[in-house]
């Protein structure tokens, strides 16, 4: 995760085209999320059929509450029209979620047993917001209370056989993943290291430095041992990236890895090691900002690395979300993923909601991403824990306020507007957009159509949703997010 970028910069990044639409009649039958009755399974598309509406307003007066239904009619409507076309099919969705950092686990475990179970159900169950994808760190991230890997040694020692490899320092994470899998056994997990063990690095430090070439094969075995150890705990690692933010060596922990080095590591060491161990965990390249699509393209253009690589992962602390589409268009047989974006303790709810829904949710999906992840799940009231030099302003989806409570932050609602209504294996379909209405649409495995709309206008916006020659006329409040299900 990036620490030092100015958050206001990101709001100015251009949104890669995206469309769809949304509505809202604020005649509220204001039902809380806990009153959800499987919103992805009801409705229809004939004249008189209802459109279910869920809304969050930037002023926080309404947060993920169901509103009065809109209704389809045979009339064409006038003014702005968002058209949804289910005949145009795009990528299948793996899921939406966050990174379950060690720090997140630490603070969630401070809740009472009952309150912790309530939170996990809220986040991961189908009656909650249904998070379907998690990222975890291999060893510590900068949002752990201490720096560690799974093979730390006294200074000057090495362990080429990895005889001292152990998950011991992550047992709390392992246990919470088991608790989460008990709620959603189908959740996908992406694992990423912030650094290799320092004895494998050319600077002997957790900050920066690079992997020594003589340890490439040992580090590949480190990944194999990790995946096998997690599998032994009943935790399947669906995918890995070789390095978090490989071009950001200033974080603690961190490690610098060029595109050439990553291609060499994958083609000559990691890929063959996975093959030899019969591991089918996906290898995803890059895992850094949208300003440098040349990095994943260099890895994918390597003819020996390419067969081992499932796709590329991106963050948006610099660049434009359209980078995902650029890479997809050049390698349409490879996947793209959006794996991290943080909200800041200095941000504001309205601005963060607007920028993140447009970019992280709508923008990434319209640019072929199979997932969309915000950063950490949870933090304490001081935006910790974090390592020395780690992020001091990262605001999680929830803030743990004590043993008895937690507060839901903007990142909770950013993800919830997708995760609650767009389950894994949904497929993106076509939608139009305009007049500061950003949209994306999906067809769920249950046959429902889901439309997510971000109204970036400061005032109310009336528009029409057109689907199968039927039209629903709706009005959406200024600076708000709506999800429509029909």
Q: At which residue positions do the language-model features occur?
A:
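Bacterial Sec-dependent N-terminal signal peptides
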Residues: 2, 20-49
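Short acidic/His/Gly/Ser-rich catalytic and metal-binding motifs that mark active-site loops
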Residues: 143-147, 197-204, 246-251, 292-295, ...
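Bacterial N-terminal signal peptides that target proteins for export
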Residues: 2-14
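Non-cysteine beta-strand/loop elements that form the S-adenosyl-L-methionine
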Residues: 239-245
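Substrate-binding and catalytic surfaces of secreted/luminal carbohydrate-active proteins
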Residues: 48-58, 62, 74-80, 189-191, ...
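Active-site-proximal beta-alpha loop/turn segments in soluble metabolic enzymes
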Residues: 201-212, 245-258, 346
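Residues that line or immediately flank small-molecule/substrate-binding pockets and catalytic motifs
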Residues: 100, 138, 244, 315-316, ...
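N-terminal catalytic cores of secreted or lumenal carbohydrate-active enzymes
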Residues: 64-237
